[in-house]
């Protein structure tokens, strides 16, 4: 009986620790050290809120850069954040990826199949990834420039400015926030 009571006490202590104290410590750390104090980075255009930089959005128009596909609900639904849970050998998953590659190539006919970045046809684990690699942005430059009637080099320079370096130069990889990149293009158009 003593062992059972000890086990129950230890379980309760760990439940309280991990469900309250640990979460509180992480939240406090984010408030002190995290970018935007651990809160959403709201993005505005012409004084109107258009999204959050840390949650991906669906862009489908030719004039915008596209992010990664999402498996979160009906496209970037933060309440349904999750991957598809389909493995890389699952026939349904392989068919989805093949269909995404075909669609990507229709909109980027200047690319060879082997040049389609994997991240542009596979969803992230959360389904809410707001960033793409610089490579994934650069392969879209020609399409976006044509759709906007802009010079390819001008759009490339916008992408160059949008590339974010790894945190402290060592944590993570270079990335491009798709929403911020599209906002930069809209602001360029409004000048």
Curated annotation (Swiss-Prot):
The chain crosses the membrane at residues 10-30. InterPro entries: KdpC. Coiled coil: none annotated. It is a single-pass membrane protein. The keyword NAD does not apply. Keywords: ATP-binding, Cell inner membrane, Cell membrane, Ion transport, Membrane, Nucleotide-binding, Potassium, Potassium transport, Transmembrane, Transmembrane helix, Transport. One of its GO terms (cellular component) is plasma membrane. GO terms for molecular function: ATP binding; P-type potassium transmembrane transporter activity. Its main location: membrane. It is found in: Cell inner membrane. It comes from the Bacteria. PANTHER family: POTASSIUM-TRANSPORTING ATPASE C CHAIN, POTASSIUM-TRANSPORTING ATPASE KDPC SUBUNIT. Belongs to the KdpC family. NCBIfam families: kdpC, PRK00315.1, PRK14002.1. The system is composed of three essential subunits: KdpA, KdpB and KdpC. Part of the high-affinity ATP-driven potassium transport (or Kdp) system, which catalyzes the hydrolysis of ATP coupled with the electrogenic transport of potassium into the cytoplasm. This subunit acts as a catalytic chaperone that increases the ATP-binding affinity of the ATP-hydrolyzing subunit KdpB by the formation of a transient KdpB/KdpC/ATP ternary complex. This is Potassium-transporting ATPase KdpC subunit. It comes from Bacteroides fragilis (strain YCH46). The gene is kdpC.
């Amino acid at each position: 009986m003593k062992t059972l009571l000890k086990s129950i006490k230890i379980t309760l202590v760990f439940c309280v620790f991990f469900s309250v104290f640990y979460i509180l410590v992480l939240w406090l750390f984010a408030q002190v050290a995290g970018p935007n104090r651990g809160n959403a980075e709201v993005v505005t255009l012409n004084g109107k809120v258009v999204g959050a930089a840390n949650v991906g959005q669906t862009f489908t128009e030719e004039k915008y850069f596209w992010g990664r596909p999402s498996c979160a609900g009906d496209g970037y639904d933060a309440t349904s954040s999750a991957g598809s849970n389909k493995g890389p050998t699952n026939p349904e998953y392989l068919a989805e990826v093949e269909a995404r590659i075909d669609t990507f190539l229709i909109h980027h006919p200047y690319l060879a199949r082997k040049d389609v970045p994997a991240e542009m046809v596979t969803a992230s684990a959360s389904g809410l990834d707001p960033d793409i690699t610089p490579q994934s942005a650069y392969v879209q430059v020609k399409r976006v420039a044509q759709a906007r009637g802009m010079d390819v080099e001008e759009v490339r320079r916008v992408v160059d400015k949008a590339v974010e370096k790894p945190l402290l130069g060592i944590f993570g990889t270079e990335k491009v926030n798709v929403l911020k990149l599209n906002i930069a293009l809209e602001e360029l158009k409004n000048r």
